[in-house]
Amino acid sequence: MSKSDYYDLLGLSKNATPEEIKKAYRKMALKYHPDKNPGDKAAEEKFKELSEAYDVLIDKDKRAAYDRYGHSAFSDGSGRGGFDFNSGFSTDFSDIFNDLFGGGFRGGRSSSKRQDGGTVGSDLRLDIEITLEDSFNGTKVPINYVTHVKCSSCSGSGSEGSVKSVQCNTCHGAGNIRTQQGFFTIERTCHVCNGEGEIIKNKCKKCSGSGRVRDEVNLLVTVPKGIESGDKIRLNGKGEAGYRGAQSGDLYVYPNIKKHKFFTRNGADLYCNVPIKMILATLGGHIEMPSIDGTWTKVKVPEGSQNGDKLRLKEKGMPVINSSRRGDMYIQITVETPINLTKQQKELLKKFDEEPNTVECNPQSTGFFQKVKSFWNDIRSS
């Protein structure tokens, strides 16, 4: 009986990409897998053909040989480096079948790995909101959440009385059951002990043998100085309690820093925009600036300061986390143009503008308009 074309089996074109091959095989394998068709020999044979096709087409070298020689590339005595499918597949199918069957599949050589002590608890995430001042000073934040906690009646064992548990006779303590189907070893969680490998004789009435119950947890979280939005605080063992005394998961607390009315932050540096009067920018002087630590600092504004200029205050920013250092604070100047001037004030400004040395007083604007004038003169003369 002649073999079907591998590309036709998977419904693919000759130039199919590896991702298309994997997608097609996943779809067909789900349809014909023996677990989905118990006792159906035709489906089992179809599944073997599909797996054989996938094993060849997903491998670059095997695919090249198949494209050149067809099925004869893998026949005994072909002289072309034949592949013996009776020895099993070299391709790792586990990622495919983990997606399809929830992680219970083992391709080729099977594994008996099982975590001792039962199913560990899940990690949990909790988001909190803090102020920039909280981040600067460090703080303690009360939190509460509901999760599985260790049962107080049985101390997490799930059992009442002195006899805790006995070995499961179905899986013999392994927690899983293996069956051989064609080329594959299928490994499933034991349905009798739910993968624990043990059976409790007298289950705790409070937790029904799970060793844990749902309850509210109240904690006080220590937020370190300098923490930023997106950082996380890990609380070991404060996540979900494990099943029947297994290890608990961790709790991850993610702080979100509220928008500040005055400062913006970039790492350990702080930034703020400060409007100053035109006269102060022109003549120079000083301004009083608040810092995040609550102190005030006298800051010198240089004579002739321009809009957008930055003034730097060293080590007036945020603490660097787990360090004694601090970032800097940057003050960006916004020069405020006077409005609602009186007639007399306007006259004084006009008089100033008419002074003979105003060109030297305004080099940027004077230079700009000189360039514009030169540009138009060049156009007219061309």
UniProtKB/Swiss-Prot annotation:
Q: Where does Zn(2+) 1 bind?
A: C151, C154, C204, C207
Q: How is the cofactor bound?
A: Binds 2 Zn(2+) ions per monomer.
Keywords for this protein: Chaperone, Cytoplasm, DNA replication, Metal-binding, Repeat, Stress response, Zinc, Zinc-finger
- Its Gene Ontology biological processes? chaperone cofactor-dependent protein refolding; DNA replication; protein refolding; response to heat
Signal peptide segment: none
Provide a Gene Ontology MF annotation, just one.
heat shock protein binding
Q: Where are the zinc fingers (CR-type)?
A: 138-216
Q: Which GO terms describe its cellular component?
A: cytoplasm
J domain: residues covered: 5-70
Q: Does the keyword Lipid biosynthesis apply?
A: no
Q: Which cofactors, if any, are listed as required?
A: Zn(2+)
Task: Fetch the InterPro entries from UniProt.
Answer: DnaJ, DnaJ_C, DnaJ_domain, DnaJ_domain_CS, HSP40/DnaJ_pept-bd, HSP_DnaJ_Cys-rich_dom, HSP_DnaJ_Cys-rich_dom_sf, J_dom_sf
In terms of one coarse class, where is the protein primarily found? cytoplasm
Question: Record's domain comment?
Answer: The J domain is necessary and sufficient to stimulate DnaK ATPase activity. Zinc center 1 plays an important role in the autonomous, DnaK-independent chaperone activity of DnaJ. Zinc center 2 is essential for interaction with DnaK and for DnaJ activity.
Spell out the NCBIfam families in the cross-references.
DnaJ_bact, PRK10767.1
In terms of HAMAP family, this protein maps to: DnaJ
Subunit description: Homodimer.
Q: What is this protein called?
A: Chaperone protein DnaJ
Species the sequence originates in: Ehrlichia ruminantium (strain Welgevonden)
